[in-house]
Amino acid sequence: MSLIIPFFTRHRMSLSTMNTFILSASMLASLASAYTQVNVAKPFMEKNIDPIVFPGSFSKSHLHSFFGSDAVVASTKSSAELQAGCTGADNPNDLSIYWAPTVLYTADSGKTYAPVPVARFSAYYNLGETPAEIPIPQDLQMVAGDANAMTKDKMIASAASEWFCENDPASPLDVNGFPSKGCSSHLQQLLFFPQCVDPTTLKTAYKDRRGGACPAGMKSMPQLRFSIRYDLRKVLPKGWSGTAPVKLACGPAFCSHGDFINGWTEEAATNMVATTKEKQHFLPVTGGLKQKNCTPKDADPKHGVSDYAQSVAAMGKREVAAWGWESRTRLPRA
């Protein structure tokens, strides 16, 4: 089997790490399988809701950026709800909702913050994993990462969160986990979700290792991975050197996390399993839906806020120099 270095890896890899990668990739080559991918051009809304962690609330969640089905509201629970919406995804059979903490930048030394423009959101399924046993179940909800992690040692290792400058040589990260030098192209994030599920309880878990085994009583499903590209070149044209003028709505890069509620049609979810079996190829997921002529928009515009400062006020926070807010109480994982 020939070694194929994935596009997302080879364009950010320094020469000093190439040999290590080749050795690791050689051992994993026999495990590498096919994958599929869904792209969304941009979020259709930023909003201070979190249907998984704070269902129904408009005052407990920090600001998130939402991609996918616009049927999502603060109380969304099911695949059927999402499948009634309009999606920005390039596969009409994917009416899932994906969200992550809004990435913010400051151009005035922290006095104000605004969302960083998103160049592209991509949801990869099963990239580099072994074949899935079962489809992603209807109504599945998942969270990857930990919104409470304020230091690197508190991060969930299996989520494998990364921040780097796409196509640029590897550079040290700053004290907050972001690149310490401005990006010549996109600021990119990667985040892996659990790939094991109990189809009865819908509880999820990670395998014991990449390409390894699921916990007892669980089956493997196509693994979801977020790949989000942000474009800072217009809003911060001079870049930066040292501490990046960037943060997440939850804090530093260490609190990176993502949320997902499955909205794939049952037919398409079943068809996705077959795309994980052929070695090292992209395969499209087919289904019975055709692209709608619609534009995703906020389904509940009268509730919640999309402005960062207003979201901070809604949470009852106070501004601090380091991150723009400090919690009076420890928030649940989001």
PLM region spans:
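Primary mode marks residue(s) on the alpha4-beta5-alpha5 output face of response regulator receiver
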Residues: 35-60, 65-191, 198-334
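Fungal secretory targeting signals
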Residues: 1-36, 332-334
